[in-house]
Design a protein with these regions (language model features):
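A short beta-strand structural signal in non-transmembrane regions
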Residues: 64, 160, 219-240
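Helix N-cap motif at beta-to-alpha junctions
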Residues: 79-80, 84, 206, 230-233
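Hydrophobic, regular-secondary-structure patches
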Residues: 37, 44-119, 144-148, 243
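N-terminal Sec/SRP start-transfer signal
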Residues: 1-37
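Short amphipathic alpha-helical coupling elements at transmembrane boundaries
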Residues: 6, 10-13, 51, 55-62, ...
Length: 277
């Protein structure tokens, strides 16, 4: 065979082969790039979802909780004395954003023929409302002072819809004491976080009401909520705070107070692994 003819045929065949495979290679590269982009986007979406849920839980309960050392798991707190020195000491720690007093008490809302179990969270005039400001959909957050108990109360949209309550409406909460005790509140605002575990039951009112209902002194509270700067170090911070409080108190991280939520969030990491694999 003529050498020139042989070389020409080989070059022609190679060119035809390149023309045939080039679109396939381009499609394959595009598919790989799209897959990688989807994986990266999925990881970011899942990470954002976990962060959003965590921040909402922090908004309801802080990062670290200080309460009476007991085995009480109910919404009826064992009282502790508010300690100004302890509060100042903890707030001076470089990783602490703020510390605030609270107490909780279970009750039943009754409106016409509707009833609903709720948890009244009592807070004082120093409470940080920033989380609820961000999630407020109607009205305003309550304003309390250090002298007279206020009847203003903040409820969720879920409670508002179930009980047909709006801003400015009167609301009765019954507390199962002996005998049953009732308190009248006025709805000052309505919030919505989308976290039904809390939205379904949580109302925010004046700490003084819980103190009176429980026959506590004015200096007695249910506990402290603490916000810290870096959640990743929460276990370390919890240990440091636990070492600084009296033996009859305990410091508990929010991860251990609501383990079911954070265990579920941790399971979402497996979804990331599945996506990456």
């Amino acid at each position: 065979m003529n050498t020139s003819l042989f070389i020409a045929k080989r070059l022609y065949a190679k060119e035809n082969n390149n023309n045939y495979t080039r679109p396939i290679i381009r499609i394959a590269i595009s598919a790989i790039a799209l897959s990688v982009a989807i994986m990266i986007l999925s990881v970011f979406v899942l990470s954002g979802f976990k962060s959003d849920i965590s921040n909402k839980v922090f908004g309801f309960g802080g990062h670290i909780n200080i309460s009476k050392f007991s085995f009480n798991q109910s919404y009826e707190n064992d009282p502790i004395n508010y300690n100004t020195e302890l509060s100042s000491e903890i707030e001076s720690m470089d990783f602490v954003n703020y510390i605030q007093a609270y107490a909780t008490k279970a009750g039943i809302i009754k409106n016409n023929n509707e009833i609903l179990g709720v948890v009244l969270k009592g807070v004082d005039q120093n409470y940080n409302w920033s989380f609820f400001y961000e999630n407020l959909i109607s009205g305003d957050t309550p304003s309390f002072n250090d002298s007279v108990a206020k009847n203003s109360i903040l409820i969720s949209q879920n409670i508002s819809k179930k009980m047909k309550l709006n801003v400015g409406d009167d609301m009765l909460i019954y507390f199962m004491e002996q005998p049953t005790r009732v308190r009248k509140f006025i709805v000052s605002g309505i919030y919505k976080t989308g976290l039904s575990e809390f939205d379904d039951i949580t109302a925010i009112g004046d700490l003084k009401h819980i103190q009176k209902l429980n026959n506590w002194d004015i200096n007695q509270i249910g506990g402290y909520e603490i916000s810290v700067a870096n959640f990743k170090n929460i276990e370390k911070y919890t240990s440091l705070i636990d070492e600084s409080i009296d033996y009859d108190l305990k410091a508990l991280s929010i991860k251990h107070k609501y383990p079911q939520i954070f265990d579920w969030l941790r399971l979402q990491d497996f979804n990331v692994l599945i996506i990456l694999i």
